[in-house]
């Protein structure tokens, strides 16, 4: 198995997704890798920018004039990211589906509670918990309803891809297009004719979309939420980040492209610092010992079945690695002499483990960081934002292995007259 696919398998098992998905399927990994090129990322980023503008106006219901509107930060950004993610999955020509949006969001919210409930029991009892507990039944309900909405669209798009002119090299305009192309390439689906196994493969692609939605929506939403908490707590960053973004737009003729983001190193540093200090996962690089292993350097023997983890948060808060590590410094990674973010936000290392490191690094990290930066800076350009609460609330709390944004933080917003 490819190492990236193996990582996907481990992560999926950790979130209990192996209970309802074929987590050994390599197609979603191959599809993401096929999009990791400048042309595909630009296509997706333009769609991301357009859909973000649309979602912002719909979700915030556009307060008028100088009126402020109070919103729950967590719920608002989760809804926004769910809407934008679904557009990236299905493409620009798919009509919004409120029912699909509701059940996709509800499914994402149910994943970890279902996992905690099931794994809180001895292994011998877990099948019964999966079948009868209210948390697991709720998750299965939303999963089946999302699948029911997606399968017809996937089948329609597979048929359209088969009928398309195959002599043209057309880049995918959505992640579903990339999934279908990957399935054609690896033989899961025939690119020419309907096969006997089509129904099962179409359902598997629908399941891959559900997996994508969870993986792209939840982590990016949490990072954007933490960026908003940070900007409300440190308003001195607002003007420089807005000014940099507007200058970057001028350099790309007003179009939101991957190049626009490259011209915004302060924004990239701000986003990376948020990942570092408010990383949603305390551990990364899940590994299972397959045969007896001895770590001679520390004299530790490990039995097969032992789970190994890398302590991401401990590394990010290590004072020997980062100066004053518990203090937010939005320009920590900004090199003013070269006007770059160094290292880049999607660059992994032994000292920056948000996306793991090495061969098992998150394959979607480039797209994920584009989502985080684009949605955050578009929000900041279009709206004034300030905290509702006078006291500074904790940014988040630990729930199992996940660092969750504080759901009590409220924000107050109003449109900016010169927003772009």
Curated annotation (Swiss-Prot):
EC number(s) recorded for this UniProt protein: 1.14.-.-
Q: Which residues bind heme?
A: 362
InterPro entries, from UniProt? Cyt_P450, Cyt_P450_E_grp-IV, Cyt_P450_sf
Record key words, sorted: Heme, Iron, Metal-binding, Monooxygenase, Oxidoreductase
Molecular-function annotations in GO: heme binding; iron ion binding; monooxygenase activity; oxidoreductase activity, acting on paired donors, with incorporation or reduction of molecular oxygen
- Any single biological process term in GO: (+)-kotanin biosynthetic process
> Which catalytic reaction applies to this protein?
2 7-demethylsiderin + NADPH + O2 = orlandin + NADP(+) + 2 H2O
Which leading EC class covers this enzyme?
oxidoreductase
Q: In which pathway does it act?
A: Secondary metabolite biosynthesis
> Which positions carry the signal peptide feature in this UniProt record?
none
Tell me its family: Belongs to the cytochrome P450 family.
Function text: Non-reducing polyketide synthase; part of the gene cluster that mediates the biosynthesis of the bicoumarin kotanin. The non-reducing polyketide synthase ktnS first catalyzes the formation of the pentaketidic 4,7-dihydroxy-5-methylcoumarin from acetyl coenzyme A and 4 malonyl coenzyme A molecules. Further O-methylation by ktnB leads to the formation of 7-demethylsiderin. Then, an oxidative phenol coupling catalyzed by the cytochrome P450 monooxygenase ktnC forms the 8,8'-dimer P-orlandin via dimerization the monomeric precursor, 7-demethylsiderin.
What the entry lists under PANTHER family is as follows: CYTOCHROME P450
What this protein is called in its record is Bicoumarin synthase ktnC
Specify the species. Answer: Aspergillus niger (strain ATCC MYA-4892 / CBS 513.88 / FGSC A1513)
